Every structure is written in structure tokens, then in C-alpha cells.
């Protein structure tokens, strides 16, 4: 963050502030809009002068879901298709409780899992190795996040 107006001195940044912004790059059409899914500053790393009137502040930030993931541990048993279990972990109020859209490719076979004190993302990465697509019959699933939401799908889709 480059500050030539002295904003950081009149409104000090301490951490835990929410960021609302759009991210654009000249070589790519469109933008990533963080106005709907806020980011949170978790550390103000460095402050230094880049010129006589300008200060640079390095902000460490992350999404709300990422910070919730770090703070949440799952110690529970689940029964159902793996895609249904992923849905419960991402959207469940006792787990990540994410407001972001979730795009899931249905998996087949009812499974039982005991999650041993893992974060939601760790739990999903553990159980995805057992998922088999109901549509593609593919046994290779990936879990990832894009600006549009979370995706749990097979390589073949």
C-alpha cells in the first residue's frame, strides 16, 4: 500500500481491519471483486518511506474463510457420499460455514469417515482421495478455490 496522503497516520492500521477492493491486471479482462467476500488484514508487516512524501506499508491479508479454516477443527464422524460430506464441511454452521458458492461434482458410494481434529480444508483433502465421480467414473478429485467460489470436482470434468 502506497500512502502519500498520510491516511495510515490518521487511520492507523493495526490488523483485523476488513479490506474491500477490486483486483485488476492490464493483461486480463475482468477483475476479482473482494467487495462481496471481504479480506481481513492480519498483520501490518513493514512501514518505510519510499520518498519524501510517500510511505509504503506491507499488509498481510487473507480471506475470512481462510482465517476461519485455521481456527476451526473437526473431530466428527460422517456418513454419506464424499460430495455430500464436502458440502456439509464447507456450508455447515459447525464447520466452515462459508457464504461463497460451492460447485460440486457428485460422487458415488456411501462412505464412513472419522475426521481426527483436522481443519476443514485438511479434512476435505483427506477424504477426496476416496471419491469416485458419479458422472465420469473418475477416481481423481481436486478441491480448489477461485474468485467465483469453491470447486470439488474430478480431473475429468
Predicted regions and their residues:
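Aromatic-residue hotspot detector
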Residues: 13, 77-78, 123, 152
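Short, intrinsically disordered, mixed-charge
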Residues: 13-15, 91, 95, 129, ...
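Short secondary-structure capping/junction motifs at helix and strand boundaries
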Residues: 29-35, 96-101, 135-141
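Glycine-rich, acidic and aromatic/proline-enriched surface loops and short helix-turn segments
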Residues: 54-55, 62-68, 79-102
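Second-shell loop/turn segments in exported
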Residues: 70-79, 109-115
